[in-house]
């Protein structure tokens, strides 16, 4: 098996390199409107935004202008997403004081409205709870009613589907779908509507411009979503690639990927992370298998994996195949190919299979 991964360092409001309806899954986290670290970026895209932040008493105009910039990208996302494809957007609301007025800016609502208005099915979303232990996390009047504010400690993982459920028309597509299944216990964990077991990523970046601009979700978040909403060999798009997390997760999961990133300063960091993918992927796949084996020891599943001969809980798990990249090469500037082999748990962890 082979996958291809391409990076374009340009504004994703124009993804003319991509054909219409060519992407199976979008996983991304855009800059959040009305969060101060992104003010400069949005102002570079539209100078009117900086003017409104300085001159106006409330932030509604700034909020709308920032979302208009994001919606240029969402229009392109809509164009390139295939029927049955899924668009997943991790976004947080913002709380901010403009002039004397403090309020919440509901970024997730504006994003839902965009895709709803274009006929997408709005699927149940996930609350990603990111608890803060900062001593200054309480806002407003402290212990005195009534002017304190609820602490904001979660983000949204919004999920949209284009034109109804995806159809798998050929036997090869149906076979790949079966081989891309996840374990029963993973399904129970991953498809919860509240995720509390993932923490945000603390960026330790040397470049001063990157420190200001980086905001990454953890690898596990992207890896889960890619396994939940795509099959091996699919094309995954991240129009706000940042440090490359979505691309790394796609490579580990045996999917192709395309990323767009406005800031060329991320190039070296992304390539260094790509270099670490081989080791990471092997660890991730073996962890999934070992966790499953520990689970099934107590569960005593009714069925057997056709490929690995360990027990599984349901028939839908019987054809699971897990691969990891054994090597990769850079085939041209900003384009990489990964080459895979199937995991052999019996060979690598024989002692774990005596169940």
Curated annotation (Swiss-Prot):
It comes from Methanothermobacter thermautotrophicus. The keyword Nucleotide-binding does not apply. One of its GO terms (molecular function) is DNA binding. PROSITE patterns: N4_MTASE (PS00093). One of its GO terms (biological process) is methylation. Its EC number is 2.1.1.113. GO terms for cellular component: cytoplasm. The gene is mthZIM. Keywords: DNA-binding, Methyltransferase, Plasmid, Restriction system, S-adenosyl-L-methionine, Transferase. It catalyses: a 2'-deoxycytidine in DNA + S-adenosyl-L-methionine = an N(4)-methyl-2'-deoxycytidine in DNA + S-adenosyl-L-homocysteine + H(+). Belongs to the N(4)/N(6)-methyltransferase family. N(4) subfamily. This is Type II methyltransferase M.MthZI.
């Amino acid at each position: 098996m082979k996958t291809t991964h391409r990076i374009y360092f340009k504004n994703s409001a124009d993804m003319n390199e991509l054909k219409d309806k060519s992407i199976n899954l979008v996983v991304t986290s855009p800059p959040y409107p009305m969060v101060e670290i992104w003010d400069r970026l949005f102002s570079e895209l539209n100078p009117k935004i900086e003017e409104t932040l300085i001159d106006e008493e409330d932030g509604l105009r700034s909020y709308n202008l920032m979302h208009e910039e994001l919606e240029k990208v969402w229009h392109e996302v809509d164009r390139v997403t295939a029927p049955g494809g899924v668009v997943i957007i991790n976004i947080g609301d913002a709380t901010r004081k403009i002039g004397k007025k403090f309020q919440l800016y509901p970024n997730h609502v504006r994003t839902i409205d965009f895709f709803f208005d274009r006929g997408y099915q709005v699927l149940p979303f996930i609350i990603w709870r990111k608890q803060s232990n900062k001593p200054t996390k309480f806002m407003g009047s402290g212990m005195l009613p009534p002017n304190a504010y609820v602490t904001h400690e979660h983000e949204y993982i919004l999920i949209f589907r284009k034109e109804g459920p995806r159809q798998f028309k050929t036997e090869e597509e149906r076979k790949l779908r079966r081989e891309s299944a996840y374990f029963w216990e993973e399904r129970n964990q991953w498809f919860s509507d509240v995720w509390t077991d993932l923490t945000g990523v603390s960026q330790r970046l040397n470049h001063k411009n990157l420190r200001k601009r980086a905001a990454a979700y953890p690898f596990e978040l992207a890896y889960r979503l890619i396994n939940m909403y795509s099959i091996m060999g699919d094309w995954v798009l991240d129009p706000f690639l940042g440090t490359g997390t979505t691309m790394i997760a796609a490579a580990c999961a045996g999917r192709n990927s395309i990323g767009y990133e406005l800031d060329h300063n991320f190039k070296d960091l992304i390539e260094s992370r790509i270099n670490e993918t081989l080791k990471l992927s092997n660890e991730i796949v073996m962890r999934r298998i070992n966790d499953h084996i520990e689970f099934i020891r107590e569960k005593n599943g009714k069925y057997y994996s056709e490929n690995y001969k360990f027990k599984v809980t349901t028939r839908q798990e019987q054809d699971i195949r897990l691969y990891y990249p054994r090597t990769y090469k850079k085939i041209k500037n900003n384009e990489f190919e990964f080459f895979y082999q199937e995991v052999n748990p019996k060979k690598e962890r024989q002692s774990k299979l005596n169940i």
